[in-house]
C-alpha cells in the first residue's frame, strides 16, 4: 500500500476534496487544523480509497492495519480515532471526541492488536493542557483511559511529546511524563515584563546553550511504563536520571538511566559532552542502583538486556556491566582498540562495534583493521579476521534490519577497505570457522548493500573519480551483477579527470599520502596550474565520485580539472600545540615534491580551503610566498579571541576546541600563551604577499564571522590585495543555490585571473558598492 497525503495539493484542488457541512452549508477546507485527505492506494490493483480530514496516521509493522485520527464530517463521519483493516477494508471507531480535539503520538503495536495515543480534548484555552493517555486492545470496542492528571505521579503530567512504544510482547506501554509547564502571568502588561538574560558562572549549561535547547527543554519527558496485566505504572526516568535507554524490543526487565548534568559545566572545556552517571532501573518495580559514576562515554544495552556496555574513552577500553551481578569487565584493556591515528589532545575514540551474537553470548568489536569476538563475562577473545597483516579493514554489513543479532549459523557479508591502495570490496565470512572469501574488490568505493526483504537480491553502488555511482543489482555471491541505471551519460562529452595517490615525506620525516587529480587529457610534458585543497586527512576518499556542482565551500575537482588545473589534496599529520606548523610541514614539501615532477607551473599555484582548512591557509600564507593566490573560507585568524567565542549554532563555548579537539592547542591561553600567539595568523599579517579571497558569512554559527572581519580589515589596513564575501543571512556555508553559484563563479574568476592570466572581473577591480548589491554582480571581464 502507498499513502498519498493531500497536504501538498494545490489550492485549486481543495474544492475537489472539500465536503459541504450540511447544517452550515459552508465548505470545510482541508488544512492543518481540519486535516487533509488521506489516499490509500493498493500497489497491486491501483485501487484507491480516500479518508477525509485526517490529522494523524500510522501503520502497524506486521499486520495490514492503519490507525488514523480525523476531525470528521458532521452528520456523516464522527471525529475521533479509527482503525482500518486494509485486508478486509473494515473500520473500527475506537475513540470519539469533538472535532477540536488534538491527538499526539498515535502508535500501533507491531501486531496491530494494540493502539495508544495522547489526546487533549479540553476545549478551553487553559495554559496547562490536560493531556490524557489512552490505549485500545483488539478485544475491546473502545479505547480506555490509561493515565491522566488524577493518577499521574505527584508533580507530573502526561507528556504530548514523549514517544509511545509497546514492548515486543505487547504487555507493556512506554510513554512520557513531564513536569508542569512554566507559564507567564497573563495579567502582566508588556511594559511590566523584564527581558534580561542572567548568566551564572556555575550553572551546568551556559545560557546560550539553554537558549538553543529551549524547545527540547519544553518538550522534556521522563520515560514511564504501564503494565497492562496488573494495571501498574512505573516511572523509569526522573529529574535525577532524566535519560533512559531500553532494548530494541523493550521486553526486558531493566532499563538504563543516566544523567550528564553533573559534568555539563566542565564539558565546555573538556569536550566530554557525554560523560554521565549511569544507573539501572527495574521496570517491574522501579528499584534502581548506581552502576557507573562518571562514565566518560555513552552506554548501550545488549540486545537481550543482560549487559550494559560501551567504550571508556578515558581508559581506551571497551567494557561490559552485568546488570544482575553488577560485574564490570574490561574487555580490551592493554589492547589497541582505540584510534591509533588520533592526533587530538584528547583521549582517542574507538573504531566501534559490529554487534552481538544471539542471547548476548558474545560481542564483536572492531580494532583498526579486524573484528574480534569477546566473551562479555570473562573478556576471553579471539581475532576473527586477518586484516592487520594486509592493512585491510573488515566491517560488518547488516543486511536485515529486523535481526537483532549477528548470525553465526550462516555466512555474513563484510565491507573491506585497504588503507594503502584505498581499494574496497565485499567479503563473505563464516564467524564459526573464521574463514572467508573475497567476493569483489577493486579501485572503487563500494556502498553498503541493501538486501531485498523477500529474496537474496542486493542493491549497491560502486564509484570512482571517473565512474558515477550507478545502481547495481546482484545476488549474495556478486556473480550476477547488473547495472540498472545510467545517470550521467553526458560525462563522456567532457574532459573529466583521473585520481591517483601521491607519497612524500613531511619536513619532520613523517611518510605522507595525498590525492593528485589530473585532467583527463594530461600531458606530462606540459606545465599545469596547481590548486591545493585540503582539510585534515582526505586520501581515503580517493575513489569518491565528484559530480560537477556549485559546492558550498570547496572547489569542485571535476570542474577545475576540466578547465586544465591539477589538484593536490595532501593529508596532514598534527603535532599538539603546533597545528599551523604541522600544516606547513606537511603541505609545503608535498607541493615542492610535485614541482619536482616537472609538470606543475611553479609560478601559478593556488590554495583553497574552508573552516579548519581556511585557518590553515591563513597560517600558510604568513609563512610562504609559494602560493600566487589563496581562498580562505571562514578562517580563525586570532585564536585568543576565538577561544572566548561562542558556537552560535549550538550555544557551546569554543574553549573545548582549543584545549582538546580540532584546534589542537592542548590547553588554555593562560597555560600556553605562546602557542596561541604563534598559531594566530593575525600577528603576522604584514608578512602576507599572497592575494586573498575570503568568504565569511554574518550568521556563521561555527566560526565567529568577526574572525573574517579581523583578517580582512588587517589586510586592508596594509593595502594587501584582498576581497571579503559575506552572504547575508548565510551560516557557515552558503546554502541557497544562487549564493553557491555566485561563490563558485567568483572563486573561478579569482583563480583564473591569478593562475591562468584571464581577464580581471569588475568586482575584483572596483568591488560591488552597497548601492549596487543584488543589482550588479560585477562578473563582467575587463578587456
Model-found features: residue ranges?
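Hydrophobic/aromatic beta-strand patches that form the interior of the parallel beta-sheet core
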Residues: 3, 67, 224, 234, ...
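Cap/lid segment of the alpha/beta-hydrolase catalytic domain
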Residues: 334-340, 344, 478, 486-604, ...
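Glycine-rich His-Gly loop
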Residues: 260, 417, 463, 533-537, ...
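Composition- and surface-driven signal marking solvent-exposed, interaction-prone regions
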Residues: 53, 96, 187-188, 236-239, ...
Amino acid at each position: 500500500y502507498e499513502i498519498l497525503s493531500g497536504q501538498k495539493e494545490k489550492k485549486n484542488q481543495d474544492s475537489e476534496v472539500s465536503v459541504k457541512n450540511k447544517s452550515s452549508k459552508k465548505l470545510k477546507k482541508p488544512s492543518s487544523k481540519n486535516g487533509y485527505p488521506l489516499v490509500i492506494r493498493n500497489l497491486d490493483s491501483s485501487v484507491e480509497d480516500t479518508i477525509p480530514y485526517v490529522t494523524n496516521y500510522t501503520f502497524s509493522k506486521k499486520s495490514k492495519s492503519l490507525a488514523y485520527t480525523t476531525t470528521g464530517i458532521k452528520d456523516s463521519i464522527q471525529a475521533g480515532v479509527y482503525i482500518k483493516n486494509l485486508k478486509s477494508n473494515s473500520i473500527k471507531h475506537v475513540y470519539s471526541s469533538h472535532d477540536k480535539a488534538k491527538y499526539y503520538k498515535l502508535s500501533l503495536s507491531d501486531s496491530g492488536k494494540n493502539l495508544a495515543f495522547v489526546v487533549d480534548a479540553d476545549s478551553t484555552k487553559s495554559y496547562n493542557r490536560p493531556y490524557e493517555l489512552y490505549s485500545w486492545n483488539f478485544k475491546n470496542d473502545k479505547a480506555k483511559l490509561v493515565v491522566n492528571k488524577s493518577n499521574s505521579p505527584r508533580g507530573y503530567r502526561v507528556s504530548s511529546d514523549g514517544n509511545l512504544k509497546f514492548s515486543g510482547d505487547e504487555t507493556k506501554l512506554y510513554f512520557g511524563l513531564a513536569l508542569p509547564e512554566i507559564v507567564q502571568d497573563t495579567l502582566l502588561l508588556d511594559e511590566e515584563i523584564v527581558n534580561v538574560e542572567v548568566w551564572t558562572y556555575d550553572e551546568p549549561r551556559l545560557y546560550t546553550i539553554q537558549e538553543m535547547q529551549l524547545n527540547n527543554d519544553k518538550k522534556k519527558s521522563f520515560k514511564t511504563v504501564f503494565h497492562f496485566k496488573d494495571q501498574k505504572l512505573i516511572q523509569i526516568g526522573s529529574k535525577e536520571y532524566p535519560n533512559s535507554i531500553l532494548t530494541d524490543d523493550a521486553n526486558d526487565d531493566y532499563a538504563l538511566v543516566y544523567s550528564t548534568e553533573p559534568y555539563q559545566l566542565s564539558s565546555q572545556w573538556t569536550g566530554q559532552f557525554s560523560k554521565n552517571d549511569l544507573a539501572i532501573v527495574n521496570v517491574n518495580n522501579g528499584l534502581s542502583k548506581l552502576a557507573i559514576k562518571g562514565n566518560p562515554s555513552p552506554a548501550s544495552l545488549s540486545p537481550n538486556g543482560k549487559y550494559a556496555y560501551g567504550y571508556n574513552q578515558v581508559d581506551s577500553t571497551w567494557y561490559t556491566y552485568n546488570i544482575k551481578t553488577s560485574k564490570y569487565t574490561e574487555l580490551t584493556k592493554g589492547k589497541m582498540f582505540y584510534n591509533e591515528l588520533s592526533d587530538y589532545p584528547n583521549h582517542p575514540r574507538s573504531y566501534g562495534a559490529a554487534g552481538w551474537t544471539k542471547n548476548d553470548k558474545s560481542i564483536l568489536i572492531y580494532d583498526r583493521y579486524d573484528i574480534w569476538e569477546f566473551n562479555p563475562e570473562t573478556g576471553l577473545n579471539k581475532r576473527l579476521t586477518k586484516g592487520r597483516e594486509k592493512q585491510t579493514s573488515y566491517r560488518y554489513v547488516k543486511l536485515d534490519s529486523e535481526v537483532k543479532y549477528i548470525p553465526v549459523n550462516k555466512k555474513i557479508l563484510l565491507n573491506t577497505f585497504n588503507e594503502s591502495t584505498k581499494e574496497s570490496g565485499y567479503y563473505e565470512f563464516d564467524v564459526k570457522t573464521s574463514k572467508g572469501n573475497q567476493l569483489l574488490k577493486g579501485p572503487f568505493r563500494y556502498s553498503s548493500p541493501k538486501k531485498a526483504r523477500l529474496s537474496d537480491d542486493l542493491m549497491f553502488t560502486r564509484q570512482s573519480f571517473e565512474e558515477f555511482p550507478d545502481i547495481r543489482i546482484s545476488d549474495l555471491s556478486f556473480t550476477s551483477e547488473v547495472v540498472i541505471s545510467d545517470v550521467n551519460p553526458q560525462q563522456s562529452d567532457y574532459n573529466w579527470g583521473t585520481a591517483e595517490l601521491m607519497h612524500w615525506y613531511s619536513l619532520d620525516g613523517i611518510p605522507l599520502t595525498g590525492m593528485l587529480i589530473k585532467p583527463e587529457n594530461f600531458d606530462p610534458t606540459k606545465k599545469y596550474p596547481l590548486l591545493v585543497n585540503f582539510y585534515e586527512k582526505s586520501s581515503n576518499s580517493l575513489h569518491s565520485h565528484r559530480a560537477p556542482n556549485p559546492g558550498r565551500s570547496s572547489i569542485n575537482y571535476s570542474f577545475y580539472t576540466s578547465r586544465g588545473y591539477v589538484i593536490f589534496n595532501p593529508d596532514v599529520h598534527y603535532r599538539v600545540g603546533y597545528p599551523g606548523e604541522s600544516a606547513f610541514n606537511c603541505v609545503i614539501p608535498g607541493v615542492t615534491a610535485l614541482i619536482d615532477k616537472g609538470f606543475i607551473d611553479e609560478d601559478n599555484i593556488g590554495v583553497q580551503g574552508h573552516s579548519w582548512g581556511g585557518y590553515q591557509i591563513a597560517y600558510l600564507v604568513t609563512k610562504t610566498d609559494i602560493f600566487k593566490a589563496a581562498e580562505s573560507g571562514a578562517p580563525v585568524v586570532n585564536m585568543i579571541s576565538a577561544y572566548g567565542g561562542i558556537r552560535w549554532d549550538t550555544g557551546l563555548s569554543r574553549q573545548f576546541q582549543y584545549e582538546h579537539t580540532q584546534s589542537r592547542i592542548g590547553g588554555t591561553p593562560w597555560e600556553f600563551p605562546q602557542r596561541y600567539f604563534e598559531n594566530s595568523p593575525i600577528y603576522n599579517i604584514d608578512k602576507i604577499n599572497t592575494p586573498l579571497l575570503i568568504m565569511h558569512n554574518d550568521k556563521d554559527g561555527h566560526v565567529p564571522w568577526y574572525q573574517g572581519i579581523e583578517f580582512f580589515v588587517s589586510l586592508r589596513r596594509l593595502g594587501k590585495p584582498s576581497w571579503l564575501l559575506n552572504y547575508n543571512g548565510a551560516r557557515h556555508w552558503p546554502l541557497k543555490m544562487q549564493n553557491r553559484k555566485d561563490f563558485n563563479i567568483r572563486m573561478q574568476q579569482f583563480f583564473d585571473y591569478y593562475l591562468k592570466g584571464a581577464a580581471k572581473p569588475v568586482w575584483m577591480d572596483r568591488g560591488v558598492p552597497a548601492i549596487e548589491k543584488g543589482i550588479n554582480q560585477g562578473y563582467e571581464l575587463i578587456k
